[in-house]
Amino acid sequence: MKNSFLPSGLALSLFSLAMQAHAAGGHHAVDDAALLDVGKCKVEGWVERETGGARTLQHAGAGCRVGPVELGLNLDKEKQTTLDAATSFGPQIKWAFSLNDVLSVGAVASAKFNSQAPRYASSTLVLPLSWRATDTLSAHINWGRNFLRGGVGQPRGGVSFEWAPISDLSLVAERFREAANNSTRIGARYALTPDVKLDISRARGLHAGGVSWWTAGVIWEFDR
């Protein structure tokens, strides 16, 4: 009788390859259904600037793979010309599972707290799905909801396509819904080294009077 079970080391390697095939994340609104490798951590940061300078956002985040999930912590500082700077922070947990060599699903839950009262601001649940169409093209779909303080909820989600014409460069296009507004984004990610990636993108709101903004960021992965 033919043995249908893969050796554990080979199975783990195939699982890791399938998960690595999906690579969005970072500052992009549409998340991927992928986790850090076992034993890996990351730190990331990015800066957003609205065209005309009416709004800026500084983000710092860190995360580590812990068993079957990825645990993270986010810190944001947002400044608008007519308001004082607002600082928020919150934890995040992410789970992902490879259905086969081209499809992965997951779940991401996070919470946001203000540095000043009222502390609790919102929580979010997102269900990502990633599909590796070819060796160079991937698609990501998100369904989710924001649960705002006071019981008000907002749907969120989107779809993105990621194309890697060469091994060190990927191009991303996405359409997404956040904070009751629809927006689009195009961007590029360059791998400076296997563990350090640089991001740049431009996004634009699709609603009447929608503004545009630029984002530049960096992601560094390292062994724990």
Residue ranges of predicted features:
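Transmembrane beta-barrel domains of Gram-negative outer membranes and organellar outer membranes
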Residues: H22-R224
